[in-house]
Amino acid sequence: FMGKISISSHQPNYNFTLFKSKYISYNWENDFKNIENRQFNLEFKSKKYFDLRLDYIDVKNLAYFTKDDFYAVKPFQFSDNINIIKVRVSREFSVNKFFFDNEIQYQKASNANGILNVPELITRNSIYFGSHLLDKALFLQTGFSIRYFSKYYMNSYDPLLSEFYVQNSKKIGGFPLMDFFVNA
């Protein structure tokens, strides 16, 4: 059983405060307040049952990019607090040379007002075979990895800024992603 408290205050990164470009819409100089984070987490680890992690995050003065009224991506700062709660359960076990690695996470951001969008449900699952080969000169892992996240407004990317920005027009997710892998 373990607990942790983390408190920080830091300036938004440089792209939020100063950006100069030959594009008229991409020039700004801002005097944003420090972003203040308070994070509390509890973690329970058990080889017999499962691992459990609880996180509570409180963010004040979050800096973010989004499109303005003229559809240009600009920096903004949200002066209220945003609260994020995460609950993660994970379990890894094996049967002979077959391995199962499973994780599920529920998360919710409150008072985010469309500024911090997160999927409510995330799962990551791997099923694979692992064994030594060639007189233990090689360890082989091969199997499938399946990931899923619930539909949400995923951030878009602005290549001029090299930054992600908030968008609230198209939801993404709600379907599984499967990969086959071989590690040697």
Residue ranges and their predicted role:
Residues 1-184:
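Exposed, low-structure sequence patches enriched in small/polar residues
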